[in-house]
Structure formats: C-alpha cells, structure tokens
A protein has these predicted regions:
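Bacterial N-terminal signal peptides that target proteins for export
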Residues: 2-13
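Bacterial N-terminal signal peptides
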Residues: 12-20
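Boundary at the C-terminal end of the N-terminal hydrophobic targeting segment
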Residues: 25-27
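Short N-terminal segments immediately surrounding and downstream of signal-peptide cleavage
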Residues: 29-46
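Second-shell loop/turn segments in exported
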Residues: 47-53, 116-125
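A cross-family detector of function-defining hotspots
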Residues: 57-104, 124-177
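Mature extracytoplasmic domains of secretory-pathway proteins
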Residues: 104-107, 120
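Short, solvent-exposed aromatic-acidic interface loops
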Residues: 109-116, 175-177
Length: 177
C-alpha cells in the first residue's frame, strides 16, 4: 500500500504540473480584427496580431501581410521604422501600425479610429468613455503613469499599455519594457 500510495501521489503531482503548465501554453491567439476574447488573461502580448503580424515577426512578413496585400478600406504607408495603417475614408491620423526594429516587429498599436475593425474587448476599450470604463473591462492595471497630458494604464508587466491623451485612446503592445 505504501508504494502504491506514493505512486498515486506522484501521478497526482504530475497531472497538476501538466495542468498548470498548459494554462500558460494554451493562451489564445488574439487577432485584433477577428478574436472575440473578452478577458485579457486568456492571451499573452506575444499572441496578439494585427492582420496576422505579431511581435517578433520579420520585416519580410510585414511586407507580405501589410504592404503587398491590399486590405479593404485601409491605406498603408511606410514612415521610417513604422508601417502605418490609415482609414481610407478619413486618412488624417493613423488608426494602427507596427514598428520594425532590427528587422523585427517590436511594437503594435491601435487607436480609437481602429474601433470599427477591432473585435473583442479592445473594440469596447476603444469605444469606451475613459479610464474607469477601461478598468471595468480589463481589471485594475499593474501600474499607472500620470502626467498633465496623458495617463498610461500598464498591464501584463508593461507589455500592454492603454494610453489616454485627451480624447484619444491608444492600445499599445510591445516586446517588453
């Protein structure tokens, strides 16, 4: 009975370890234009994509997915290290974009001009009324940066940032702080 009891304990321990490890591995892919994920705990920043582009993707993939392919209603411009996406209906300010650094994507952003294309929780954040509504949707931020011109709510160790600047809302995803 002693050996069998220890064996069952080892099996239970191994199963719990697999369960804990699988929750980190099973983070959902989050395509900003398609995914209906409503809880930020269900994805990692590295799993967020903008028209198929994720943090860490190569410049070649950015060219293939954003620059060469025509996205309906979207105008694409390359500005220095940024690939900016504009709404063709009113191309005054960028609605989304990525930054390339050393040939890889290290930053993705979307603004409230992107809300009509966004899905899931970020559609609600971009259409929201402000900081308190964002906190209701995403939960309490890990830390806040406040100044006279903007407020930054930092989530996921600072790799996901919600920036409020006047009436503008920007959601930023980055490789790390």
């Amino acid at each position: 009975m002693g050996v069998r009891g220890r064996g069952m304990g080892v099996v239970a321990w191994a199963c719990s370890l697999v369960f804990v490890m699988s929750s980190a591995v099973n983070a959902e892919q989050y395509e900003l234009t398609e995914s209906e994920v409503m809880d930020i705990a269900h994805f990692n920043t590295s799993d967020v994509s903008l028209f198929g582009i994720k943090i860490g993707d190569s410049e070649a993939k950015v060219k293939d997915n954003l620059i060469k392919i025509k996205i309906p209603g979207v105008k694409v411009e390359v500005q220095d290290v940024f690939v900016m996406l504009y709404d063709k209906r009113s191309p005054s300010n960028a609605m989304a974009g990525v930054r390339l650094l050393d040939g890889k994507v290290d930053y993705i952003f979307i603004t409230q001009r992107f809300a009509h294309l966004a899905a899931g929780v970020f559609r609600l954040v971009l259409r929201g009324e402000g900081i308190e509504e964002t906190r209701k949707l995403l939960g309490k931020e890990e830390f806040t940066e406040d100044s006279t011109t903007f407020t930054r709510l930092n989530y996921k160790g600072g790799t996901m940032v919600i920036l409020f600047s006047g009436r503008d809302i920007t959601v930023e995803f980055n490789a790390g702080v």
